[in-house]
């Protein structure tokens, strides 16, 4: 039985904002009826609207252009606080160099820590702790000049020694064991003056600027016990499995945060999360799905991409999935457009490989429909592989992530037409991390894999045969060669083509059943504004504000 009956469309109107978001204000029933009659037209026009929004560019600016959606009169005010519901607690350690397994943890720590560079809302790499940089022609030596006057949250000035310590630690230069895979290519980090450091790489890397977002921390603290960064918010406290508190950092070098305090409340039940929004127990929640925001009358809803690849991720070493024909059969048995329509009310962007549309230089739209739904073809492939009576397997899904539970339920129904029997095992997030992601003790799972940066390698590196994050156990000499070619060239065009070759191999070899970049909805109380989507999985609380009364 399907998880629910496909209901009526979400009752809201969409307005284009300058930064490419869609601001949604829930409307009354009479307006909703008129909107429903126009749904088909809206779906077509949305495609045009998206292209226009992309052209607009720019981040959210409370004082700037607000054409296209209503904004209350008055000025954004500094001060106040917000309570944000999150569906899972952060990692047990908030050491920024080791707490990278959870996307949710990285999402929050984005507000606390900064690297030499950071990503802006348009996906550009811009200086943060660094003020400027130069790169040699071989792309194997990067020189950074530090920004003057930056302070850590403990009040100390940021020095070149702190930067050298942070990057050396993250790259494992003393231990030989990198803590952060993105900077494992660093061969040496040296200070050449009071404000200048030179980083030499073991191999050329034209994407290195996208990797040097690794947190800069003080050299004289224990990062396993103290959470000290340079971001717009400082860590103020935590109650495990209950809440995390961030406070505004008054000496932040950049644009100050509007809010004085952000409390992240752990609510591990999706229904309770929605009820908490409706009752006002919390003011904001991110990563909601269409069926949830239907219920949130009177709240401001912002829609944007998740910038993560949702798929039925397959353990390629598990028999029968070690046979490419079986994996391809799964691809033919799944109708991802139906998944969008049934589980997401049509919201989302279909994908065909491990790349999402926001990384437009690398995204390959022609792979989206590489496997047209064909249950008969799926049965044929299973028979060729020696399974004429079909196969059975278990899909392990994080129980707190309703969008993935819903997707898995639709998939289970679809697979039956191809003679495939699947059952769902819902587990808590901690169990999923330990058993699936780290332990690789699973057959298949439905999740979304995000990119912690804007480099293609952030999404594709994990599928190398020997990569520690290759939890699906995908192994392909062809893929490894293509990836090596991509990261070793200094020719941007050749690199892009090599990364696209990697994407094509993942699709052709059916490493996973790729589905979509899900639409993500952020709900905020009616007096909160300013949320900005980035082309990666982060939540920027510094831009959220209230209007002065």
What are these regions (language model features)?
Residues 249-294, 421:
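Ligand-site clamp/hinge motif
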Residues 121-124, 205-263, 269-272, 376, ...:
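Gly/Pro-rich hinge or "lid" segments in bacterial periplasmic/extracellular proteins
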Residues 85-135, 168, 228:
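N-terminal lobe/hinge region of extracytoplasmic solute-binding protein
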Residues 349-384, 401-404:
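Structural transition elements
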Residues 333-361, 403-412, 433, 437-549:
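Detector for C-terminal structural segments
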Residues 83, 159-166, 194-198, 231-232, ...:
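Alpha-helical secondary-structure segments
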Residues 87-106, 129-130, 156, 208-215, ...:
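A structural "hinge/loop" feature
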Residues 134, 138, 178-220:
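Surface-exposed binding/hinge segments that line
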